[in-house]
Amino acid sequence: MAPSSPSSARPTRASGRERSAMAEEIHQNQEEEEEVVAASTAKRRRKAASSGKKPKPTPKQAKPAVAGMKKKGETEKTEPVVDDVCAEEPDEEELAMGEEEAEAEEQAMQEVVAAVAAGSPGKKRVGRRSAAASGDHVPEFIGSPVGAAEAHSNWPKRYERSTAANKPEEDDELKARCHYRSAKVDNIVYCLGDDVYVKAGENEADYIGRITEFFEGTDRCHYFTCRWFFRAEDTVINSLVSINVDGHKHDPRRVFLSEEKNDNVLDCIISKVKIVHVDPNMDPKAKAQLIEHCDLYYDMSYSVAYSTFANISSENGQSGSETASGISSDDAGLETSSNMPERTATLLDLYSGCGGMSTGLCLGAALSGLKLETRWAVDLNSFACQSLKYNHPQTEVRNEKADEFLALLKEWAVLCEKYVHQDVDSNLAGSEDQEDADTLDKDEFVVQKLIGIRYDGTGRKKGVYFKVQWEEYGPEEDTWEPIDNLSDCPLKIREFVQEGRKRKILPLPGDVDVICGGPPCQGISGFNRFRNRDEPLKDEKNKQMVTFMDIVAYLKPKYVLMENVVDILKFADGYLGKYALSCLVAMKYQARLGMMVAGCYGLPQFRMRVFLWGALSSMVLPKYPLPTYDVVVRGGAPNAFSQCMVAYDETQRPSLKKALLLGDAFSDLPKVENHQPNDVMEYGGSPKTEFQRYIRLGRKDMLDWSFGEEAGPDEGKLLDHQPLRLNNDDYERVKQIPVKKGANFRDLKGVKVGANNVVEWDPEVERVYLSSGKPLVPDYAMSFIKGKSLKPFGRLWWDQTVPTVVTRAEPHNQVILHPTQARVLTIRENARLQGFPDYYRLFGPIKEKYIQVGNAVAVPVARALGYCLGQAYLGESDGSQPLYQLPASFTSVGRTAVQANAASVGTPAGEVVEQ
């Protein structure tokens, strides 16, 4: 059931009389990051005819193995299968990573305190008195004051009398004696609604604002109020304004209207400025004419909350009012019909892994009435690609680098233009006639058909390669051939391109409705001692962020959803997060950024991640779904982005479900031993909690249409309930860890806890050794985090949660032991902590499966986001408010099926079984 891998390596067969050295050079250049893909570039006696003739291969001979190559008949893979047994001791990197994680946790808690102390990051704009205004011309109001009744009606808070509970020094709103409609500054008359420059602080560019009030304060001073415009560099984008994404740049004349206002004294006004409102969907020519004679223009609004760039809600920038909480809700029922939704949309999943993000998005979109289909997926890990293809058989899964995928898309567009959009029949007729006239030489053979396409950007011969199926040869003899070698086979190329375009094996601009993905940014990893803080994008390990945005710029999807670790907002002053925002805004996308905690959506783990929405100006900008579950708080948001945490306001008292615990997630799973060779087994018991009943549902009950109307394979079976096998020494150690809450290596013989919670050897106990002769308590456990750690060989408990699901299962420096069994958590137990349905099967060695699960986006988070995406796509929500309160029934979708299945279970739905 493995997917067809366009970039899979296969040793080429030497053809004709000699094999070019070119193929060998390709091998040498591809060993570092991916499987070597050899391409036959053999010299030919003569050009092949249009039928695809090629010099016949010489008789197959045994060849020495080339590093990184796959022998014929072997399973295709990007790296060798390793023994699925835990390492005897943690390596230096593993221990260092653990120490980095501990430091990060401590720093995160400090940031929470700092964020609370700092309050809102919004900057109050206080104007400075203009030098010109301090001359002979004293600023003054013009005309009679606005009538008292009108003034009190338009600006009621200005006339509220301060009370003991609302002292003037605590009230940000200046009080007014009267209001005016115009004023004169430096002999220039200004009226309400005028756009002006306002003198800013030292070394700051002058502020830009729209006058909304003129009033005389109770202190007899003359004031004006401005609703501020922001330049791109004034927003959270800040210094990241010089980016260039596929030709898209920030226009220095473009500004963004905000809802922020400040009061300043009248003589801070410098001059008028002509600013026009431009409809973001206006014809480019009409837009050029409109802004030709203005100083500045705006087509979007900006809000510090969720770093939002959005369409102006109504004409001329008169933004519609929002609710006080900035939250919208929909009490309508969800789409729970077993019939597929009528409206469809296409999805491209970049850096897809095993498909957690796209799976969740599709499940959530289906609940809103939108059938979101994952049509394409790209990932470099071949095992993850196998998992995704198995669970989404209709998806075109490509096992290749994202930058080579982008290069292929551009070449594919050229091929489609040549062979699909143009009339090429007349040009190919002569080739077909010539092919009939040619006779087949004894050293030539025929191309039967082309069955795959990829782009090779690493070898000396860069460009498009086709996978060729040779006439009279089996699949094991298929080879990858550069397009130049098939230049005399236009009929075969046309046939492949036309059929491929019909099936949409690759997307063209306009084909993709949604792009999602989490570009890896390993250059900001805490363990990376050589991180480039000044220019993070010059680090090759961060370049995938650029590639992701380049793909967005090329395909121009309606929607973009990027996921990443919170470190992109912390490292180098949030450089990578700001870069991503800057790219979308420069490409004229609406955008907003939020941080979401997985536990808030029904999982027993914390796991905070960043999610960045992008939407074309013609579409509704999606909201963020508010939490539905309580959660144990761990860490916090970076100061500059503290208003991006997706959460209820402190003044609100939402009705949240009780936080889920480990017992809720997997207390129903059968006992397994340290070594479990079977990846398919029976449950052997009934579910005990609502979560367990839900996670066991079949595809149709979850509205997963990956197999169409079919049920899909393996449903009803327990999959991947296998732990990483502990080595003999660790297994002996784990068997001696007590079965109790909080147990760890400190409970082993010979360990004593001294001052400051630091472990030390108990001088009264002789050191205990294992049957292998190694110590029961390893030295690394005693010295980890300077002897203060509780993590080595730590046992989880039923009433706890985990900080995050990790990609490795070694117990040396993390708490990952099962509550009551002598083993680490299984792949399925980890998958449940990530919200993967039980029917979701994984492929590859056991360690690879842990990696796939740990790297995935938590499915319930993606599901909630998918629902908001569907609401926006279908036009059933507006983009003015950043947050959305999910319907009360959202967390119990599938309840009909759940309750039906629960009929034979003693525990009522929603009741958690105590362990």
Curated annotation (Swiss-Prot):
Question: Which terms does the UniProt entry file under GO BP?
Answer: methylation; negative regulation of gene expression via chromosomal CpG island methylation
Recorded GO terms, molecular function? chromatin binding; DNA (cytosine-5-)-methyltransferase activity; DNA binding
Which residue ranges does the record annotate as region Disordered? 1-171, 315-338
UniProt domain Chromo: residue ranges: 445-508
What domain of life?
Answer: Eukaryota
**UniProt keyword annotations, A-Z:** Chromatin regulator, DNA-binding, Methyltransferase, Nucleus, S-adenosyl-L-methionine, Transcription, Transcription regulation, Transferase
The SAM-dependent MTase C5-type domain covers: 345-876
Biased composition regions of type Polar residues, renumbered to the chain: 315-328
Composition bias, kind Basic residues: at what positions?
A: 42-57
PANTHER family for this protein: CYTOSINE-SPECIFIC METHYLTRANSFERASE, DNA (CYTOSINE-5)-METHYLTRANSFERASE CMT3
Which protein, by its recorded name, is this?
DNA (cytosine-5)-methyltransferase 2
Per the UniProt entry, what species is this protein from, by scientific name?
A: Zea mays
Q: Which gene encodes it?
A: ZMET5
